[in-house]
């Protein structure tokens, strides 16, 4: 039995990055051998075990053969006869197909170290094209390592285009797709993930609503970048630079989907795109079974982001409706995330990246003014039910009128 550290742990060590997760592969062992040594089986599709002391995952060396469509269309074979090289060749990229023994000796049969030094993301073998999930994985790695100067090898990008055109991306489950998308959006340069999917034709298959934004013009006075797709990439880039959470990044990606529905005759204006885009945002959310907090914020940002930009011009009654739509009294964090998405939208325009966004503090102040209204005096007057609700709304409206007068 020989045990090797494989994949990301080896790659990250060679890159000088912190190693967080460690994967191990075991060569020359059977399931019975692992059980005798106290390892606990956890794998369902292939033999994976937890170390009895560290709880790290140890997988038996295995081969795989394509047997159907999609990510799950494979037959796996694990036995003591499977070599380390056979196990490594089934991996996606050469930089992920290296192994280290307990003494730190490197096994690198597919030149992963060379590609690491050359900053190239290259597939290990033609079998890459058998797994559609790898299109998303490579795009995610491109987003992760763009800051290090990594690019995708032309031949690998060619296979990604081939996979995208094959229709196999549609066989990916919502869960697997969202796992990759959500991880990619939390990388340092998530806009690279979307750009790569666009370049290889995968965005058209996975999120045609986002793909439709490329080539759609906006007024140059407000959007020097003009292209709506380019704008969305810039907004996403800003959301990562400001370290915003997944909810905000997802909302940034989807906020302008309605512009893809604007008739060409109306370009570059996009009247009511906030409302026309809602059904598209809902469709994307449902397609990937997106978590509820991400769904809700994306819909709210899509509907109200122009309210955010015009915050200082809004009538107090409109401002009150906005605050109530976000339930700022019970969910203040969601309104804060809305403000963040609006600010990223404003900064995601070429030449506006460093421009101040006074609407942010104004909206925060408005929320604070409305929240400061106490219901207690109204209760002491004996009000209840609809009468109480109407009275509380009127008091909040008064507070917002006072706030607007003293601020704007």
Swiss-Prot record:
Catalytic activity: a tRNA precursor + 2 CTP + ATP = a tRNA with a 3' CCA end + 3 diphosphate; a tRNA with a 3' CCA end + 2 CTP + ATP = a tRNA with a 3' CCACCA end + 3 diphosphate
BP term (GO), one: RNA repair
Signal peptide stretch: none
Entry keyword annotation includes Lipid metabolism: no
Database matches in InterPro entries: CCA_bact (IPR012006), HD/PDEase_dom (IPR003607), HD_domain (IPR006674), NT_sf (IPR043519), PolA_pol_head_dom (IPR002646), PolyA_RNA-bd (IPR032828), tRNA_CCA-adding_enzyme (IPR050124)
Acetylation as UniProt keyword: no
More about this protein: A single active site specifically recognizes both ATP and CTP and is responsible for their addition.
Subunit structure: Monomer. Can also form homodimers and oligomers.
Name by which UniProt lists this protein: Multifunctional CCA protein
Organism: Pseudomonas syringae pv. syringae (strain B728a)
Gene name of the record: cca
